[in-house]
Amino acid sequence: MIRQIDFYGYPYVGIYAANTEQVVVLPPDLPQATVDLVAETLGTAVVRTLINESTLIGSMMTGNSNGFIVSDLTLDREANLLQEHGKVTRLKGKMTAAGNLILANDTAALVHPALTDKNIEAIEKTLKVEVRRGTIGGLKTVGMAGCATNKGILVHPRATEEELTVLEDLFKLPVDIGTVSFGSPLVGSAILATTKGLITGTRTSGPELGRIEDALGFIEE
């Protein structure tokens, strides 16, 4: 199932929300009708909470079927809601916007090159994936420069051949380049996707949507 939805009048659904195959995390003040559409489209349960008292959930956290990595500033009451759906680990240090720093699915994670060995070990243990440092399109904020499901990966259009090869080797999935919202290269900022459904903002064009569908495995060959 594929839908185009905006949050708060903006197309950046990947900044205001985060999801795994099982659950989508949404701000408490999002209209219930929108929440219902998101859950139906992605085929997930819903957790409604802020992260670090912020609606920028997609920037502050990431996760997969095994657990969640969140900002070190995440409140206990916020983490407790997530813990009903998996282990929660706080990212320690100065860089805590986990959603910006980590691109993950159920088998692998690419992370910001400056993340510490200790943080990488924590990510490996919580998400139960192989972790590698890297960039996408020269950007260290790989979480916003890409979108990964268990079927495929879409990344920044300026990703180099070397970066694409690293991603394909790490995730063992097809990788393609594309844009969202009429030319934005930060594809992770405007996509929420599982293997069952896909949401992007209303500014994403038809050709962009076709590329997204193809990259994330929604078009059968």
Swiss-Prot record:
GO molecular function, one term: ribosome binding
Keyword Cytoplasm: no
Membrane among keywords: no
Keywords: Initiation factor, Protein biosynthesis
Any single biological process term in GO: cytosolic ribosome assembly
Family note: Belongs to the eIF-6 family.
Stated name of the protein: Translation initiation factor 6
Gene source species: Methanocella arvoryzae (strain DSM 22066 / NBRC 105507 / MRE50)
Upper taxonomic lineage: Archaea, Methanobacteriati, Methanobacteriota, Stenosarchaea group, Methanomicrobia
